[in-house]
Amino acid sequence: MLKFFKTWTLPISMLAGAIGYFVFANVTFLEPTKPFMYTLIAYLTPFLIFAQLLLTFCKISVRELMPSPWHGWLLLIQAISSLVLAALLLWLPMREEYRDVFEGAMVCLICPTATAAAVITGKLGGSASSLTTYTLLSNLLAAIVVPLVFPLVEPHAEITFFAAFLKILGKVFPLLLFPFFLALFLRRFMPPIHRFLAGLRDMAFYLWAVALAIVTGQTVKSLVNSEAEIYVEILIALGGLITCIAQFYWGKRIGTKYNDRISAGQALGQKNTVLAIWMSYTYLNPLSSVGPGSYVLWQNLFNSYQLWKKRKNELE
């Protein structure tokens, strides 16, 4: 049963999230619980993201973190590509539905590397330590860029840019960076707790599954309550596909020049989509969360193909 769940976690979690939303939206006797559930989810999602990052960073040593030239190039691609889309959203007049397409793509570009990317990288024959280093660096980049850009892209009349900047900074910066420093603190001053957390091999995986179900439910809610035409939702999903293809392509191309093609491809292409959906749903137009929501499918389809191809080559 456990093996079945691990194999089919992605569709099971997404299906559970979608069904969960429709149950709470349509079952009348659950109506009184809605305010509590909305509040719970608002706190639970960032907590699950924090816990995943903490468990991931507890498994690594600072001595394993090795900066590489390709790290700089990939960070530059992430920053420039997301800032270009932000500039288009700021200065190019466009209809609201097309803004959602660009917002969804922008989140897919600035979003940091997935915590599970090191596992896939190792299975594909890449350098897990180099990938983990980039995961930390991409978290730092997102923690800086997101609070600066999101309030400009999606301003609110009732709050100033500086107030919005501080609000997002206060939530995103600790969420992405504190897990690393907490892991270092536990390793140095509380070794028993650190060893316990590092020994929870599959816990981050299960936390990811729960978080994916929650953000899928939020994405479905955005789709159901949106007045946008179906073609707009398709365009947002296509934006996720284009950014997925582009990032895997450029990651692998740059990685080839430094003899680390697999690691660089996964570093730029495999995203922390739970975080991306949460950020777009919380700080941008909620409909834009369809972009990173579709990215979940695109990156997992590509990773499945890569793993299948590697197994096929090993058998030949």
Describe the role of every protein-language-model region.
Residues 1-316:
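Alpha-helical transmembrane segments of multi-pass small-molecule/ion transporters
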